[in-house]
């Protein structure tokens, strides 16, 4: 297999993590091809991460604007070519540009017969409308790609492999977390998930102009549950997304509604058996409580060697689940944590393997072993 991968927005919080992960998975899967990055104007963060990616992954750099070539070369980087050269050299393009800026890259990717993978925040209907306004022909097959459910490889890899799409949109960070939890809960008779996501609003790339002790409560349901509903159509989702101006992980407080009698032990066991889900004991065998999100992240991360910190590919779920019996249904109140910059990375990488034609029966094990993604119960009952 050979499939060269290109990254737009290579220095973004998710994309740089995806690039390093893809390099590891490409090698593990025996897939040949270059890893290319498209540069804009040089700035400190981009210069720093390009140096790291060059050392670790041997990336090849291209510039969007020929006027920036000399600037990048002055920092000691070799520039392979320009905007069109980047797309000609790439068979697969991961677009991680800021929201609302994806269309020209999608257009160039399709014009060069690239597979295009979008991150969760992209607005496909808007992108398709903008392409049509620019005179791009939208075939029935391409229209189906823009309207297809979100890609969540643990559930729908085989369906996507049969469809052979040119455009894929991966689940976002919180949607990925909801989908993994849904995958664990479905065998127990899951009917509905409702509740609230406290979305952190203090990421490294975000300047927060808000009270440090105030929360934006949000209006109506967020896209996260709605997007998960395209993957798990039999489940009803009603999830609000608020914003908390902190750097803690996104923290979801959700109610899982099951038909019939379900025990917390059943749910914990199913969560621990689901790929890329880790159950965190509220109280460990030594009697120490794990009740603060910052301490939970520190405790988990300390046991792994990963290229960029923080890097938590796993959904972390506290075992402090509160069961409620309501008639013929059981409701489980659950607290779970999503590290926004890295949880979707395994899914991004699977979108690349999908386009490379990698077999469905090997894909999840290959990704988890290459990235050392674990599932189970922390600290000593974890496996790939």
Q: Where are the regions a protein language model picked out?
A:
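N-terminal Rossmann-like NAD(P) cofactor-binding subdomain of oxidoreductases
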Residues: 1-206, 363-367
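C-terminal substrate-binding/catalytic lobe of Rossmann-fold NAD(P)-dependent oxidoreductases
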Residues: 13-75, 196-199, 205-335
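Electropositive phosphate-/nucleotide-binding environments in soluble metabolic enzymes
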Residues: 12-16, 80, 99-103, 176, ...
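Generic structural motif
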Residues: 157, 200, 259-261, 338-342, ...
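NAD(P)-dependent Rossmann-like dehydrogenase/reductase catalytic/cofactor-binding core
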Residues: 304-384
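Active-site catalytic microenvironments for nucleophilic, acid-base chemistry
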Residues: 184-188, 257, 354
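Hydrophobic alpha-helical scaffolding
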Residues: 171, 217-218, 338-341
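A broad, structural surface signal
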Residues: 88, 183, 269, 346, ...
């Amino acid at each position: 297999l050979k499939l060269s991968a290109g990254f737009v927005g290579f220095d973004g919080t998710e994309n740089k993590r995806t690039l390093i992960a893809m390099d590891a998975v490409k090698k593990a899967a025996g897939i040949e091809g270059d890893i290319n990055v498209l540069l804009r104007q040089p700035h400190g963060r981009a210069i720093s991460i390009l140096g790291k990616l060059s050392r670790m992954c041997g990336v090849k750099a291209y510039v969007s604007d020929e006027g920036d070539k000399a600037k990048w070369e002055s920092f000691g980087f070799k520039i392979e070519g320009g905007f069109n050269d980047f797309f000609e050299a790439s068979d697969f393009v991961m677009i991680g540009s800021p929201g609302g800026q994806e269309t020209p890259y999608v257009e160039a990717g399709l014009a060069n017969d690239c597979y295009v993978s979008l991150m969760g925040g992209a607005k496909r209907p808007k992108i398709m409308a903008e392409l049509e306004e620019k005179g791009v022909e939208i075939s029935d097959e391409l229209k189906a790609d823009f309207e297809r459910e979100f890609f969540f490889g643990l559930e729908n890899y085989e369906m996507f492999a049969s469809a052979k799409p040119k455009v894929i949109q991966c689940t976002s960070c919180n949607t990925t977390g909801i989908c993994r939890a849904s995958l664990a809960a479905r065998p127990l008779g899951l009917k509905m998930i409702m509740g609230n996501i406290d979305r952190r609003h203090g990421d490294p790339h975000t300047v927060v102009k808000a009270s440090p002790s105030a929360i934006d409560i949000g209006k109506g349901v967020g896209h996260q549950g709605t997007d998960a509903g395209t993957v798990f159509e039999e489940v009803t989702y009603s999830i609000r997304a608020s914003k908390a101006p902190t750097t803690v992980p996104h923290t979801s407080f959700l109610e899982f509604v099951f038909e019939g009698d379900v025990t917390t032990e059943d749910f914990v066991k199913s969560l621990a058996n689901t790929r890329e889900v880790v159950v965190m004991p509220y109280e460990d065998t030594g009697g120490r409580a794990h009740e603060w999100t910052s301490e939970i992240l520190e405790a988990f991360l300390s046991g792994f060697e990963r290229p960029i910190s923080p890097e938590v590919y796993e959904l972390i779920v506290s075992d402090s689940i509160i069961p409620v019996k309501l008639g013929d249904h059981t409701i489980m109140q659950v607290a779970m944590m999503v590290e926004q910059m890295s949880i979707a990375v395994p899914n991004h990488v699977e979108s690349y393997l999908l386009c490379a034609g990698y077999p469905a029966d090997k894909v999840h094990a290959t990704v988890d072993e290459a990235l050392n993604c674990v599932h189970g119960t922390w600290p000593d009952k974890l496996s790939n």
